[in-house]
């Protein structure tokens, strides 16, 4: 399920994988930020280094659906990938790259896929919790790229309109090493 525990574990896992010097803070609910953030259920504010999660909206996106419901397959990783993308944006911010243009949106999708590849490996977490992606989880992330595109948005919520472009960026992240 997509809840505070799983989102907390997700952010802990990303911290173990990337060990940022300044890990982003995680909050639930709207956060004050000096830039407009769009309507994504998870956003990143560079000035406060904070990832804000609208948990009810994220949980709805993460509710399992399948072809029997005449819907694209979606599930927890549809929601998790959105949070991962905002964590990647935090890492991008710490590297000093531009966050508010289409290039940033596509770079974020690419980096999200790289993170997803790392999340398919087992990792020991200080809390003792665990989270490891499986092959079917990638389908759920791709479904999100097709239906809402939140993973491929810039810091201000502006995305890339073409779903195939979003998927190409994500695919590049799956097929390249971590140094890009």
Language-model features: where?
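Sec-exported extracytoplasmic/periplasmic mature domains
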Residues: 12-19, 88-96, 109, 113-121, ...
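Surface-exposed patches in mature extracellular/periplasmic domains of secreted proteins
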Residues: 19-32, 95-104, 119-138
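Solvent-exposed loop/turn segments at secondary-structure junctions
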Residues: 33, 57-61, 88-90, 96-99
């Amino acid at each position: 399920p997509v809840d505070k525990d799983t989102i907390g574990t997700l952010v802990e896992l990303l911290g173990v994988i990337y060990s940022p010097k300044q890990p982003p803070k995680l909050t639930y609910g709207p956060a004050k930020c000096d830039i407009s953030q769009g309507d994504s259920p998870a956003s990143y504010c560079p000035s406060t280094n904070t990832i804000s999660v609208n948990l009810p909206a994220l949980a709805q996106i993460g509710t399992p659906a399948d072809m029997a419901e005449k819907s694209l397959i979606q599930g927890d990783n549809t929601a998790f990938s959105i949070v991962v993308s905002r964590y990647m944006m935090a890492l991008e911010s710490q590297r000093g790259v531009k966050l508010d243009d289409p290039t940033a949106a596509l770079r974020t999708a690419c980096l999200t896929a790289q993170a997803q590849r790392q999340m398919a490996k087992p990792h020991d977490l200080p809390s003792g919790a665990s989270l490891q992606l499986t092959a079917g989880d990638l389908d759920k992330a791709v479904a999100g790229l097709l239906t809402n595109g939140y993973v491929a948005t810039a810091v201000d919520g502006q995305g890339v309109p073409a779903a195939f472009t979003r998927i190409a960026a994500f695919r590049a992240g799956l097929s390249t090493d971590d140094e890009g």
